Amino acid sequence: MVLTIYPDELVQIVSDKIASNKGKITLNQLWDISGKYFDLSDKKVKQFVLSCVILKKDIEVYCDGAITTKNVTDIIGDANHSYSVGITEDSLWTLLTGYTKKESTIGNSAFELLLEVAKSGEKGINTMDLAQVTGQDPRSVTGRIKKINHLLTSSQLIYKGHVVKQLKLKKFSHDGVDSNPYINIRDHLATIVEVVKRSKNGIRQIIDLKRELKFDKEKRLSKAFIAAIAWLDEKEYLKKVLVVSPKNPAIKIRCVKYVKDIPDSKGSPSFEYDSNSADEDSVSDSKAAFEDEDLVEGLDNFNATDLLQNQGLVMEEKEDAVKNEVLLNRFYPLQNQTYDIADKSGLKGISTMDVVNRITGKEFQRAFTKSSEYYLESVDKQKENTGGYRLFRIYDFEGKKKFFRLFTAQNFQKLTNAEDEISVPKGFDELGKSRTDLKTLNEDNFVALNNTVRFTTDSDGQDIFFWHGELKIPPNSKKTPNKNKRKRQVKNSTNASVAGNISNPKRIKLEQHVSTAQEPKSAEDSPSSNGGTVVKGKVVNFGGFSARSLRSLQRQRAILKVMNTIGGVAYLREQFYESVSKYMGSTTTLDKKTVRGDVDLMVESEKLGARTEPVSGRKIIFLPTVGEDAIQRYILKEKDSKKATFTDVIHDTEIYFFDQTEKNRFHRGKKSVERIRKFQNRQKNAKIKASDDAISKKSTSVNVSDGKIKRRDKKVSAGRTTVVVENTKEDKTVYHAGTKDGVQALIRAVVVTKSIKNEIMWDKITKLFPNNSLDNLKKKWTARRVRMGHSGWRAYVDKWKKMLVLAIKSEKISLRDVEELDLIKLLDIWTSFDEKEIKRPLFLYKNYEENRKKFTLVRDDTLTHSGNDLAMSSMIQREISSLKKTYTRKISASTKDLSKSQSDDYIRTVIRSILIESPSTTRNEIEALKNVGNESIDNVIMDMAKEKQIYLHGSKLECTDTLPDILENRGNYKDFGVAFQYRCKVNELLEAGNAIVINQEPSDISSWVLIDLISGELLNMDVIPMVRNVRPLTYTSRRFEIRTLTPPLIIYANSQTKLNTARKSAVKVPLGKPFSRLWVNGSGSIRPNIWKQVVTMVVNEIIFHPGITLSRLQSRCREVLSLHEISEICKWLLERQVLITTDFDGYWVNHNWYSIYEST
């Protein structure tokens, strides 16, 4: 079977294939690709395919490696040359990286790796083979892979005895992306207790339990699990115990023992993570003491949805950012302005970016940075002869943004208490008298900041240096190209003076820049070329502290304050980091590595003391004034305050293990015994082997080298063994109700069993949820059933029935599987159906006009949400949706010409009406459209074909199932007849003086009549008293397996004279020419069933959308009826007194709307 696709889809597929094959494929490969979608037995089809491909400007055809412009027919018919199809280099880069070669930053070597990974396709390639294929140094491959890591998916595996990564390209990899949803440990507390309870002897190892429940996948889950175990032990739901191995008493494992059930409630509000919870490792684990000090983040109690539903919320508009106004002060130098701004900023200082924004603007950032190098100082590089107006720049950062902060000398002294490190001279040196006026000095010494030194060769062959734009060159002189500026080399010794001249201007310029300093500025003190980033400076001592930046100085002072507050002694752990962060007012915890670096600097400057405990390896810090006794008291206090765990020891008991490795470790004997046993087994095997060899030598003569060859072959085969990667994509057979997938599977399983067996088969469903109890599943289902409501339930059932019919038709499942209720196969059908719906692609052209030609653009603003979407929502969501909806109406009259749309609607109506009577017809047989232009008919037919309303088979038109399905589903008029009969029966009973007792939930049809009579005050309703046992009830829905009313209701007539309503007058059904309306046949007569179906559909839309307008009705029924047909139906209903008009030309149903067909 050949799957036909659009030409643009084929071009995209071919482009991707070329990109995944290093930018070029052969012509035969092109036929293999397109052969999946087109029948290439005909040469014209091949010509069409190749023409579509080469029409794309990025795709080129090569003949023997050279680009050719031959005709498509010549290329296909030429068998003497080798042809291939390729794409341009920029297109190759764009398809693989999303950027052109100039825009991308990954580099050529990394792109070469990317090409090989793309060529490997879905199979992928490991890093070892990747280095061999590309010929790159394996040591460099790792860094280059990091540059393209965002484009790849990787998984670790063992290959030839090495741990390598299997790499695949995300763009061409079709593996499902593993979802990593957030897991709230509160929801799993009851599961942990239940699993331990059902385990053997009610005891489980902590590590083994964590692996079974899959809490060992990431560090956060592992910490959360340990915190949960500690909380359950504290609340006495579980008990921590040590279990001794029966074979080796030296082996003890940490376990938990079941004590009692956890209360039946959603989560545990009082549960909090314990920062000092013990880990689950063995007793001798050296990491236990370190992990005890790690804090675990608290559980998330914040719910954004609940917050938004609170009353009294106030919406504040965000004020527009104030635009920076540049000073552009022409009267004072930049140095004076910079000093003034830095002086006004006080001890806080001001960043260089803020200064630039205020004085010159961002456009002159680089120029300002260069000019400020003359007067800005650092602590380790101070200038002279600057008077009392000195500016210091200090390295600082905010998050990842690094910059310099400017201070005046006086403010910096106050900030750092470093009067000794910063000297403030009394004044400037006296300047000598100048005989040249100021104007001449300015003209002689003016140099633009963006000017550069250029050079050329004069007529004598000498290099001439000049500022750009200042040298006048004669017209006949030949200027050396600039591109040789850096590549010119000194030829011989005669040009030695010229070489000296080349370097002299640079040296002169450098000497001018650093004439006031002893040595050139280091890279650490100067910003980068773009002025956006800076590098950390050296460690500078001021005020007794050693720091690299202002932030480091602030942290060190905060550390001293915290140490004084807590008593002068502390462990370097999470609690200490949080205390420092809290003191500094930081919303997040400071980086541990940064704080440790500050502590080391404080230890070097003797502001703190530090030592490391020899046993636990933990670091303790203290103030120099604290004595040894205080330190020992603190250590003993921390040990005594630590909660004792695993105090109970259990001997001679059997426990269940999920992990076989842990089971073998628990039952392992002493190592000496194991070694003796293995040695005895080796000796026994050697004797048996020797006897077997002797027997074989007697029976046959064997070459001596056979054994060696076999051993060598065994080694070679072992070396050639490839790693088999486990296929993770398998049909899921086990679920857990605590996960999102598990809840979805539970809902689907209930829908499947209820629709097939007409009852919920809990015995079948529980097999899919082995880790959940039946009561837990029922509670989960009850909550979901109440939330979805009856309409949501019907939506699920209808969807499942549709999928089941399609699966049986396509033979994906047999009737036997359905009858035997094989839930695994049935749920897999559902899952595969949803995946196909999601993956269905839609490709558009770049040109908007092409899209208008190829596609029918349908306005979907009125169909944003379907009925099922609203039905699947909760009551609160429905209410919020209604409150957010804005009801508007256009006041001004529309001036749009509706003649064309009316003509198209008439053509649609005629075609629908004809195809209902004769499902297949030709266009020439439509007599009703003889007076309509052929172009209009063709356009409408193509639109209807794209909307899947008709099929085109040559010149014949064939009706699809769309129209009959809509009429059958939305036009069920039989309920109206049943409702009218029910109304007659009720009238007879009540007119006879009888009452009606209702002890079951009324059906939909009977509720129409009863609500109508009650709202018209024609009935009275009372409660029948009954004695019943009062017991606590839980909230359940009336629609959910409980249909009995408690107590029963009784209804009786209020006034017998008003029960018999006047019968509706007969109104003529609108008719016309043959096939002019959907309910008119070829002879001009009415189609009764079609008429009742379209009327029912219109009435139902008005019932559920009160006040709906005619245009809105037409948009909701556009697949069946035209605007003219709907207006005739509404006019007929108005005359029948079924509808009532409202303001703004809307419609509303009358009180007895269900009696439409009373006399028809």
Swiss-Prot record:
Residues where Phosphoserine is found: 546
Keyword tags: DNA-binding, Mitochondrion, Nucleus, Phosphoprotein, Transcription, Transcription regulation
Region (Disordered): 475-533
GO CC aspect terms: mitochondrion; nucleoplasm; nucleus; transcription factor TFIIIC complex
Keyword RNA-binding set for record: no
Note: Present with 125 molecules/cell in log phase SD medium.
Chain's role: TFIIIC mediates tRNA and 5S RNA gene activation by binding to intragenic promoter elements. Upstream of the transcription start site, TFIIIC assembles the initiation complex TFIIIB-TFIIIC-tDNA, which is sufficient for RNA polymerase III recruitment and function. Part of the tauB domain of TFIIIC that binds boxB DNA promoter sites of tRNA and similar genes. TFC3 is essential for cell viability. Cooperates with TFC6 in DNA binding.
Subunit structure of this chain's protein: Component of the TFIIIC complex composed of TFC1, TFC3, TFC4, TFC6, TFC7 and TFC8. The subunits are organized in two globular domains, tauA and tauB, connected by a proteolysis-sensitive and flexible linker. Interacts with TFC1, TFC4 and TFC6.
Full protein name: Transcription factor tau 138 kDa subunit
Record organism: Saccharomyces cerevisiae (strain ATCC 204508 / S288c) (Baker's yeast)
Phylogenetic lineage: Eukaryota, Fungi, Dikarya, Ascomycota, Saccharomycotina
